[in-house]
């Protein structure tokens, strides 16, 4: 249960949401070129240490995370990440995922 609410899991969920949003914008809306999506899928990642370092400057955890992901993905593909989303979209969805992960543990323990 502790791992679900750990900072690293939260950011891993953020990353999954961002990549899934890009995949949807490519597949459904045709807004992201295939070559950029391939780069995003291959290179998207984050470093906890780097996110903390950026957050000291920005005072915003989501912006720090997005800057770190952009560093890894590269300028052109990075312009697609988080486009059309808000910080609340990311935070609220992540909270729902963490609650679901926690509920699965609780239900399993009850059974």
Regions found by a protein language model. Give the residues of each.
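A helix-coil-helix interface module used to build multimeric assemblies
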Residues: 1-111
């Amino acid at each position: 249960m502790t791992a679900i609410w750990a900072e690293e899991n939260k950011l891993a969920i953020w990353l999954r949401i961002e990549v899934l949003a890009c995949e949807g914008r490519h597949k459904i809306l045709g807004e992201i070129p295939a070559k950029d999506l391939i780069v995003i899928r291959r290179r998207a990642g984050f470093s906890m240490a780097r996110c903390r370092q950026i957050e000291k400057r920005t005072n915003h955890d989501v912006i720090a995370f997005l800057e770190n992901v952009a560093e890894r993905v590269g300028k052109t593909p990075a312009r697609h990440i988080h486009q059309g989303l808000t910080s609340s979209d990311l935070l609220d969805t992540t909270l729902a995922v963490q609650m679901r992960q926690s509920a699965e543990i609780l239900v399993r323990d009850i059974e």
